[in-house]
C-alpha cells in the first residue's frame, strides 16, 4: 500500500505535563476532534480513552505512554500521552527519545510545577521543540499571564503568548489569536460552534501590546525579520508564522497557547499550532548511529529510500496478541512478515504483524514507512532502546538512558503455586519497564524489587495480582543505596588452584578510578602483547560486573567506576574463563581497601507548598531531615519551598506535613541525584548490613 501521508505531513508529538494538569483530557479532546472517538471520556469518571489499564482508570493518572495515530488538516499526527507522575519518569524519557516535538500542558492556576520542570529538562536534553498549552482556563484562580511568567522564571524559557484568553474562570469564553489579530468566541459546550470576530474593544490594547512583544521576540531569532522590524517595515502574518516555526524547531522559542480541554475550548487551535509550528521528520537532523562492523558514525536521513532503521522504545504485554514492541521508524520501509536485525543484541528477528495503535484498540497494517510509529508482534529478544535495522545496512542508534531505581521492597509469594508464577510475572514486568529491577538476595534468598518510587512499585505489585493472578506479601519500602570508589587505586587479583585433575589459574592487574556521576561502570582493556589472552578478557569484565552487584561496604551495587585491565598472566593448561572471573572479583575486593569506598543515597528535589504561617515549620522539617533549602517563592498566600532532602528521611513526611499545616500543605518529590551519605549514617548502614544494629 502506498504511503498515505507524505513525510512533510507527518507529526510525531508527545503530550507532557505535571500530574493533574489535564494532559489526558487534552489528548482525549484531540482524539475527539480528529474523529477517532465519538464520545468523550472524562478522566474523573474513569472512562478515558488513553488510560486503558485498570490501575490508570482507578487512580485517574496515566502510567504507560499509549501511542495513537490521528489525522488533522490532511496531516497524520502520532501522539504519545506520557505520564505526569514522577515515579514514571522512564515513560517520559523513552517517548521523548522518539518524538519530533511536544506539547507541554500547564495548569493555568499553578503554572510550571515540579514535574513540569523535570520533563522540560528531559525534553531540552533531547532537543525536542515544544509548544505550551495553558489548560484549565475555566478553573478558579486561572491566570494565563502568571503561567507565562513561571515559564520565564522557573525554566528560563524564551516563551511568548501567541494567544490571549478572553475572560477567565467561569467567564472564560474565547481566545484572541495574536497572529491574525482576531477573536474566536465559543458559543456551545462542545467547542464545535466557533465565531471569528473582531477583538472586543476592552481587550484591544492588551492584544496590541502582546502582538508587539511577540513580533519583537520572533524578530530577535531571525536576522532578516530583525532588519525589517528595525526599519519599521510591517511584518506580515505569513512571515511571523514562518519565523515562529523556524525558531520553535530550532528550540529557541516556545509559543504559548491557552484553553480549557475540559470545556472544549482552544484544542482545535492547539492542533493547528502542532501542524504550523512543530517539526515533521524532515525538519530535524538525521538520526546518527554507529556501524557495528566498522565502529564508524553513520546517519540515516528520514526517507523511504534509505535502508530500514528503527528504535524500539517500549515493550507491552497485550492480553490478546501477547508481546507488543513499539518502535519509531527513522528511515526506510518495513513489511509485515519480513526479517530485521536487532543490532543491539546481534539477533535476527521476524516481524509477525504490524499494528497501529489507538489507545488500546488496534488496526493491522502491512507496511510502515519512515517517520511512522507502530507496534510489532512476534519479536522475542528485543527490549527498550534496541535498534532494529536492515540486515544488509547495520546501525546501532543511540539508546535510551535508564535512571537508577531509588526505592526497593521485599516481595514474598503467599503459596508454593504463587512462587512459580511470581518469577514469570516479575520477569515480564521487568521486560516492559527498564527502571523496574528484580534481584534475589544471595544471603537470604528473598526476592527484592526496586523502582522509581512507592507508587511505581504499588502499581507493579497490583499488576502482578490482577494480570498474573499472583498473591504476594510486600515488605516496607527501603532506600536503594549505591556504593562507589572515591580514590584511584591499582590492585592484583590472583587465583590459583592446583589439587589433582585440572587446575585453575587466573592473574590480573586492574586500575580502578572514579567515573563521572551517572556514567555507571566502564571497562577498558589495555592489555598489550597477549599477557592475558583475548578470549579471557570478557570473563574479566563479567567477573567485575557480577561482583559489583554486591558492594564491598554494605552489599549495595557499586556504580560510577572505571576499571582498566592493564597486566596479568596465564597458564597454558589451567587458565579458564572461570579462573579469570574469580581473579577479577578478587582484584575488586583488594582495591576496596585503598579506593576509599563510599555509600551513596538518592537525593530528592522536594517542593513543599504551605500557608505563610507554616513556613517556619517547613524550614525546621528540612533541616531535621538532613536537607538543604534551594530556594523559596511566594504564590498568593502560600510559600513554595524547594529543597534537596535524602529519600531515607522522607518516609512518612506526608503525615508530618498534614498535621503541621492542618491539611493545607502539599509536597511533591522528584529524584535528582545520588550523593555521599555522612560518615555517621554510613556507619549505621554498614552495622545494619552486618546485623549489628
Curated annotation (Swiss-Prot):
Residues 8-282 form the tr-type G domain. It is found in: Cytoplasm. It comes from the Bacteria. One of its GO terms (molecular function) is GTP binding. Gene3D superfamilies: 3.30.230.10, 3.30.70.240, Elongation Factor G (Translational Gtpase), domain 3, P-loop containing nucleotide triphosphate hydrolases, Translation factors. GO terms for cellular component: cytoplasm. CDD domains: EF-G (cd01886), EFG_III (cd16262), EFG_mtEFG1_IV (cd01434), EFG_mtEFG_C (cd03713), EFG_mtEFG_II (cd04088). SMART domains: EFG_C, EFG_IV. Keywords: Cytoplasm, Elongation factor, GTP-binding, Nucleotide-binding, Protein biosynthesis. One of its GO terms (biological process) is ribosome disassembly. The keyword Kinase does not apply. GTP binds at residues 17-24, 81-85, 135-138. Catalyzes the GTP-dependent ribosomal translocation step during translation elongation. During this step, the ribosome changes from the pre-translocational (PRE) to the post-translocational (POST) state as the newly formed A-site-bound peptidyl-tRNA and P-site-bound deacylated tRNA move to the P and E sites, respectively. Catalyzes the coordinated movement of the two tRNA molecules, the mRNA and conformational changes in the ribosome. Belongs to the TRAFAC class translation factor GTPase superfamily. Classic translation factor GTPase family. EF-G/EF-2 subfamily. This is Elongation factor G. The lineage of its organism: Bacteria, Bacillati, Bacillota, Bacilli, Lactobacillales.
Amino acid at each position: 500500500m502506498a504511503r498515505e501521508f507524505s513525510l512533510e505531513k507527518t507529526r510525531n508529538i508527545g503530550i507532557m505535563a505535571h500530574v493533574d494538569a489535564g494532559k489526558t483530557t487534552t489528548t482525549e479532546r484531540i482524539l475527539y476532534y480528529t474523529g477517532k472517538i465519538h464520545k468523550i471520556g472524562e478522566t474523573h469518571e474513569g472512562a478515558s480513552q488513553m488510560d486503558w489499564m485498570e490501575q490508570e482508570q482507578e487512580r485517574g493518572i496515566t502510567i504507560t505512554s499509549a501511542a495513537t495515530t490521528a489525522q488533522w488538516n490532511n496531516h497524520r499526527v502520532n501522539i504519545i500521552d506520557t505520564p505526569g507522575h514522577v515515579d514514571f519518569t522512564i515513560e517520559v524519557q523513552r517517548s521523548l527519545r522518539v518524538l519530533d516535538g511536544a506539547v507541554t500542558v500547564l495548569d493555568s492556576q499553578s503554572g510550571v510545577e515540579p514535574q513540569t520542570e523535570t520533563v522540560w529538562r528531559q525534553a531540552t536534553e533531547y532537543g525536542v521543540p515544544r509548544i505550551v498549552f495553558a489548560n484549565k482556563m475555566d478553573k478558579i484562580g486561572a491566570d494565563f499571564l502568571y503561567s507565562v511568567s513561571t515559564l520565564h522564571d522557573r525554566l528560563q524559557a524564551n516563551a511568548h503568548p501567541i494567544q490571549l484568553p478572553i475572560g477567565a474562570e467561569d467567564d472564560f469564553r474565547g481566545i484572541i489569536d495574536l497572529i491574525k489579530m482576531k477573536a474566536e468566541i465559543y458559543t456551545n459546550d462542545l467547542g464545535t460552534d466557533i465565531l471569528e470576530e473582531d477583538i472586543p474593544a476592552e481587550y484591544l490594547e492588551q492584544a496590541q501590546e502582546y502582538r508587539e512583544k511577540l513580533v519583537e521576540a520572533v524578530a530577535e531569532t531571525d536576522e532578516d525579520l530583525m532588519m525589517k522590524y528595525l526599519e519599521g517595515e510591517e511584518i506580515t502574518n505569513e512571515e511571523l508564522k514562518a519565523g515562529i516555526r523556524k525558531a520553535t524547531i530550532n528550540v529557541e522559542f516556545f509559543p504559548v497557547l491557552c484553553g480549557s480541554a475540559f470545556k472544549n475550548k482552544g484544542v482545535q487551535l492547539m492542533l493547528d499550532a502542532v501542524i504550523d509550528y512543530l517539526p515533521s521528520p524532515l525538519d530535524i537532523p538525521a538520526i546518527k548511529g554507529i556501524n557495528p562492523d566498522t565502529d564508524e558514525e553513520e546517519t540515516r536521513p528520514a526517507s523511504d529510500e534509505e535502508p530500514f532503521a528503527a528504535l524500539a522504545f517500549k515493550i507491552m504485554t497485550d492480553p490478546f496478541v501477547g508481546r507488543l514492541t513499539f518502535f519509531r521508524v527513522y528511515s526506510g520501509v518495513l513489511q509485515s512478515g519480513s526479517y530485521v536485525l536487532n543490532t543491539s543484541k546481534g539477533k535476527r528477528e521476524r516481524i509477525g504483524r504490524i499494528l497501529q495503535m489507538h489507545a488500546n484498540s488496534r488496526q493491522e497494517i502491512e507496511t510502515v514507512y519512515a517517520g511512522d510509529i507502530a507496534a510489532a508482534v512476534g519479536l522475542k529478544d528485543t527490549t527498550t532502546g534496541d535498534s532494529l535495522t536492515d540486515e544488509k545496512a547495520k546501525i546501532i542508534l543511540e539508546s535510551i538512558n535508564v535512571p537508577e531505581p531509588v526505592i526497593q521492597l521485599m516481595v514474598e509469594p503467599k503459596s508454593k503455586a504463587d512462587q512459580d508464577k511470581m518469577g514469570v510475572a516479575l520477569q515480564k514486568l521487568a521486560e516492559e519497564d527498564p527502571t523496574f529491577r528484580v534481584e534475589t538476595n544471595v544471603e537470604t534468598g528473598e526476592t527484592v524489587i526496586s523502582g522509581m518510587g512507592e507508587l511505581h512499585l504499588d502499581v507493579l505489585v497490583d499488576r502482578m495480582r490482577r494480570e498474573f493472578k499472583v498473591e504476594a506479601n510486600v515488605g516496607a519500602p527501603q532506600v536503594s543505596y549505591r556504593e562507589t570508589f572515591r580514590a584511584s587505586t591499582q590492585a592484583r587479583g590472583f587465583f590459583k588452584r592446583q589439587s589433582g585433575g585440572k587446575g585453575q589459574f587466573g592473574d590480573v592487574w586492574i586500575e580502578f578510578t572514579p567515573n563521572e556521576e551517572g556514567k555507571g561502570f566502564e571497562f577498558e582493556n589495555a592489555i598489550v602483547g597477549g599477557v592475558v589472552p583475548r578470549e579471557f578478557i570478557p570473563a574479566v569484565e563479567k567477573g567485575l560486573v557480577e561482583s559489583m552487584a554486591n558492594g564491598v561496604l554494605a552489599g549495595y551495587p557499586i556504580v560510577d567506576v572505571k576499571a582498566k585491565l592493564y597486566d596479568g598472566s596465564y597458564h597454558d593448561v589451567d587458565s579458564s574463563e572461570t579462573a579469570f572471573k574469580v581473579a577479577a572479583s578478587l582484584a575488586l575486593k583488594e582495591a576496596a581497601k585503598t579506593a576509599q569506598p563510599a555509600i551513596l543515597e538518592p537525593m530528592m528535589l522536594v517542593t513543599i507548598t504551605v500557608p505563610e504561617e507554616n513556613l517556619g515549620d517547613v524550614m525546621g522539617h528540612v533541616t531535621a531531615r538532613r536537607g538543604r533549602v534551594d530556594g523559596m517563592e511566594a504564590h498568593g498566600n502560600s510559600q513554595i519551598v524547594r529543597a534537596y532532602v535524602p529519600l531515607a528521611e522522607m518516609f512518612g513526611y506526608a503525615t508530618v506535613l498534614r498535621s503541621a499545616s492542618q491539611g493545607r500543605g502539599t509536597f511533591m518529590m522528584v529524584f535528582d541525584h545520588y550523593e555521599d551519605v555522612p560518615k555517621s549514617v554510613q556507619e549505621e548502614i554498614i552495622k545494619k548490613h552486618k546485623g549489628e544494629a
